[in-house]
Amino acid sequence: MNYLLTALIALLAPISVAYNVPHGFLTGEAVTSHSGPNDLDGELPATDEVKREKRGYFFPSHFQSDSGLLSRSEHPNEYLKKWITHEHNRYRRMVPASDMNMLYWSDELAASAQRHADTCDFRHSRGRINVGENIWAAPYSNYSDAISIWFNEVHNPRCGCNHAYKHCCGHYVQVVWAKTNLVGCGFSRCRDVQGVWGRGHRNVFVCHYNPQGNTVFVTARGQLYAMPAFTWASGDNGKCSNCPANAPACYQGLCYMPKNYEAPTTTTESTTTSTTTEEPTTTCEPDEPEAEGADNNQEEEEENNDGFRMRV
C-alpha cells in the first residue's frame, strides 16, 4: 500500500526543469550584441574567419535581415545627441588613461548607425571600414541604460577584462578606446528584432565609432595580441600626459582640440615663431570647453553636465 501511494505522489508531483537560456531571454532585460575583434589591415590570416566575422557565424548563411520589421525610425534630436556624447565622455573620464580623446558627435556615423538600426537586425552590420559598432536591444524603448551596460562589462568578475579586446567585454573596450574621437547613434522601434533569443525585444539602439576599437593582430610567433584600449596613466604620466598632436589640450582628463588653437611652428630662415589656426572638423561639440578659461569654468560645466537626463 505504501509503495502504491509513493508511486502515485511521484506521478502527480510537479516536474521542474532548468533550461540554460541566454541572459535577457525570459527576464525581459536589455541585451547587447557580441562584439568581435577588428583586425589591422592585412595582419590577421584570411582563414581566421571566426575571429574576423564578429558575430555573424552564430547564424546560418540564409539568415537575412527584414526591413519590413521596422515600425518607426527615430533619429536622435539635438538634446539626445548631446546626452549620448556626454554619457560616452563621462565614462571615458573614469578610466586612468593618459591619451583619452574627447568624443564628438558625427552626423555621418549617426546616419550609418540609423541605417543598421532600421534593419531590426541584432547581427553586426557589414561593410564598415574603420568603424566600430555597439548594439543594444530591449523590450522597452528607454535606452538610457545602453551605454552603462556596455561600460559595466569591465566589472564582470567572470570576464577578467584587461582593458583589451575580449569576447565578454568588447563593448566596454570600444566605449573607452582612446583613439576614438567620433560617435554617432541611431534608434528604431521594431515589430520584432531578428537574432535575439526569445521574444519581446522590439527596440534597437546602435552606435558607430571612428576610429574603431577592439584591434587585434598576430605577433611574430603567430599569437593573437589584443591592443590595449588606452595608455595607462601613472606616476609622472598622468591623465592627458600623452595627448595626440590633433588633440593637444586637456579638459577633465580628456584630450581635445580647442577652438582657434594656435599651434607654434618654427621656420628655418629666422628665429621667429609663426602660428597657424586650425578648426575642428566635427559636426557637434557639446562637451568641448572654450579655449580660454576652461579650467575656471570646470565646476560650472560639471554642474551643467549633471543636469543631463533622458526619457525616451
Swiss-Prot record:
This chain's function reads: Regulates body size morphogenesis, but does not affect male tail development.
| Compositionally skewed regions (Acidic residues) per UniProt | 285-305
The chain positions of domain SCP read: 87-209
The family note in this entry says: Belongs to the CRISP family.
Carbohydrate attachment residues: 142
Out of the domains of life, which is the source? Eukaryota
Q: From start to end residue, where is composition biased (Low complexity)?
A: 265-284
Protein name per UniProt:
Protein lon-1
Q: Species lineage, top-down?
A: Eukaryota, Metazoa, Ecdysozoa, Nematoda, Chromadorea
Keywords of this entry:
Glycoprotein, Signal
Can you name the source organism? Caenorhabditis elegans
Q: In which tissues is it expressed?
A: Expressed in hypodermal tissues.
**Where in the chain are disulfide-linked cysteines found?**
none
Any one cellular-component term (Gene Ontology): extracellular space
Q: According to the UniProt record, where is the region Disordered?
A: 265-312
Q: Which GO terms describe its biological process?
A: negative regulation of BMP signaling pathway; negative regulation of DNA endoreduplication; negative regulation of multicellular organism growth; positive regulation of growth rate; regulation of mesodermal cell fate specification; reproductive process; sexual reproduction
Q: Does the keyword Glycoprotein apply?
A: yes
- Kindly give the CDD domains that the UniProt entry links to this protein: CAP_euk
Q: Which PANTHER family match?
A: CYSTEINE-RICH SECRETORY PROTEIN-RELATED
What InterPro entries does the database record attribute to this sequence? Answer: Allrgn_V5/Tpx1_CS (IPR018244), CAP_dom (IPR014044), CAP_sf (IPR035940), CRISP-related (IPR001283)
User: Which first-to-last residue range defines the signal peptide?
Assistant: 1-18
